[in-house]
Amino acid sequence: MIQRPPLPDGMAPAAAAVPALETERLVLRAHTRADWEDYRPVLMSDRAEYMDGKLDHTGAWACFASELASWLLDDIGYWTAARKTDNKAVAFVGIMQPSVYPETELGWLTTEEGEGQGYAHEAANAALDWAFGPRGLTTLVSYIDPRNARSITLAERLGATRDDDADRPEEDDLVYRHPRRAA
């Protein structure tokens, strides 16, 4: 029998494949079933307006599960960004390349409670450091709906610049290219 190290409550053994990252206020960790209760309202509400619109329960679950499955398939995926003080999910940040994406993308979602607190910026910075450091990626973009002013502002705060020549999954998407960080 294979011995596995103990995992935090609510995490399945496959979650051990997801690297945990820490920032000043957050822990970026694998999604757990408990996080679904914070994730679902984001994708099933108007908060998903710039991500192809709000989804039904099945569509939201498919997104949640694919973000975790991506770790097993590609060694990249989404993290739940949880506050250190209470382990409450306040954002979901990750690196993925679904089959329809021409390049690997850094993306983010915030819960209503997490909006405007700087959590997505903090978590995305940690994800960028990991992507260009230990993970060894050489390029990373964010695909953003041109109406999503908050995400455009966040991408620019992260140092990304528009790349109008890049391929994109949706014709209207803006592509923001993140500068490579020192490993």
Listing of model-derived features with the role each one plays in the protein:
Residues 57-58:
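Conserved phosphate/ATP/ADP-binding segment of small-molecule kinases
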Residues 72:
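Extracellular/periplasmic catalytic domains that process cell-envelope and extracellular macromolecules
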Residues 75:
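Beta-strand acidic-aromatic groove motif in beta-rich domains, primarily in extracellular
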Residues 1-50, 61-69, 78-183:
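Acyl-donor (CoA/ACP) binding surface of acyl/acetyltransferases
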